[in-house]
Amino acid sequence: MSTSDFEERVVTVPLRDANDKPVQQRADYAVKIVRGHLAKHFSVDEEDVVLDTSVNEAVWANGRQNPPSKLRVRAARFVEDGDPVVEAEYAE
């Protein structure tokens, strides 16, 4: 793997749009927002974004009805088996 195949950044993901959903779906939708935001900014498909459990725990920390308004994640993009993959973990 060459250095051009690896990229790591700390990204702030806005989750305010999750409040447009019904209260029973907000945390679920917030996880989808994180996955979509990282896929867009790292130029990969949403299926190629792997979220660490720490991201899930941070979204669900206040319960299903009240996800945080924004979330900072440390994301790394690299090539695995010829396909670009993004792995993300919660950045405190």
Task: Show the residue positions of the predicted features.
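Compact, Lys/Arg-rich rRNA/RNP-binding cores from ribosome-related proteins
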Residues: 2-92
